A protein has these predicted regions:
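Serine-dependent acyl-ester chemistry module
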Residues: 4-154, 158-159, 166-170
Length: 170
């Protein structure tokens, strides 16, 4: 099933948090890279891997998933985001995000907005960590997660491929 063939909402509904499935996808990715390495080595074709850059700051998660106990807290976050988020004091926004993340530490949307708060404070190191956590916990992983980037780095090293770290060049 291809996303372009489906209604957007239907496509998003098909994505659910499934750590087992995620590990299987990562294993398949590793195996695909290994097979590419064998074929390119046999054909004496050089390989250049490019670590993909991503827009951390201006691209929220495609899908976040709330779990049962955190539902009311997450609803408060959703209401706050829809009703004058930036008109609220930074301390209030941070407290709400901390409450959400305490209840649901893997809630990507809260991690993303926590990054926005860190940015607003000028704490760019913690902002980058929060934004990356939002990518890593995105239910619809259309951007490279840390584990995907690590797999690429490992294979570049293992098979002596050239590696371009595009994010570090930006």
């Amino acid at each position: 099933m291809c996303i372009r063939d489906m209604d957007y909402d239907e496509a998003m509904e098909s994505y659910q948090r499934d750590d087992h499935w995620t590990r299987a996808v990562q294993d398949h990715f590793r195996e695909s890279l290994r097979r590419m390495a064998l074929k390119t080595r046999a054909a004496q074709v050089p390989v250049w891997l490019v670590l993909p850059p991503t827009n951390l700051r201006d691209c929220p998660p495609f899908k976040s998933e709330r779990m049962g106990a955190a539902r009311q807290v997450e609803d408060r976050l959703t209401d706050a985001l829809q009703d004058g988020w930036y008109s609220r004091p930074l301390t209030e926004r941070k407290a709400l995000l901390e409450m959400v993340l305490q209840e649901e530490p893997r809630f990507a949307l809260a991690q993303y907005w926590q990054g926005k708060c860190f940015d607003e404070e000028g704490d760019y190191e913690n902002a980058a960590k929060a934004y990356q956590a939002a990518i890593d916990e995105d239910i619809c992983p259309l951007r490279a997660t840390q584990s995907t980037l690590q797999i690429l780095r490992e294979h570049a090293s293992r098979f002596d491929w050239a590696l371009v770290d595009a994010p570090s060049l930006l």
